[in-house]
Amino acid sequence: MIRRALHAVLGPSAIRICGCALLVAGVLGGLFPACAARAAEAAPAMPVVAPLHRLMVEREAAEVWGIAAPTARIAAQIHAESLWRPKAASQYAHGMAQFTPATAEWIAAKFPDKLGGFDPWDPVQAVRAMVIYDHWLTTRNPGATECDTWAFGLSAYNGGEGWLRRDRKRAAAQGAEDDVWFGQVEHYTARAGWAKRENRSYVERILLKLEPAYHAAGWSGAPACEVTP
């Protein structure tokens, strides 16, 4: 595979996104225009209310991940889910972290010591549930790198763990690398077209666009994916 060959020659710091590479200083960059296009979008605007929740997000993330908590990544996910609106509501999901009633009921029963009586409309409880669910999903669905692990976790958060596992199985059956998201598993699914687009866009937007924007604004945590313009 091109990705593995480049990894062997250039090392992991040069290879990360798109399954084909974002290479520093433009080395071989002309060969991978699609990768450059993914990272080239202007930084998204951060809602003015986001900094008001920063200490709460840092506290809740640290409860699960400790001092190295990926606060900027959690902030990026909240941004994608609800634009930081505690009363955000869609047809099937509610609150800042957009939990469906079924998932809210499940996670409250799964983690009663931390989420007993979980109210998805409460912003603190919503963020607490999000970080706990993210940790549960990423632990159960590891990938080749931290970037891949988080891509799998976010895909499962958005579309369900069952769909993620079917996608990985389909990728492996077609000879793709089932532990790599970008350029590999992301291309394999039996989901409806709209569901695939929504799910893949969700992962890409959080990891490649929103998380870097929150890092640039000073939110803490090491990036999951290396994004080189």
Language-model-detected regions and their locations in the chain:
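N-terminal secretory signal peptides that target proteins for export/translocation
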Residues: 1-12
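Bacterial N-terminal signal peptides
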Residues: 18-30
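Generic signature of mature, soluble extracytoplasmic domains
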Residues: 64-71, 79, 136
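Cell-wall polysaccharide-cleaving catalytic domain and substrate-binding groove, primarily
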Residues: 79-103, 160, 206, 210
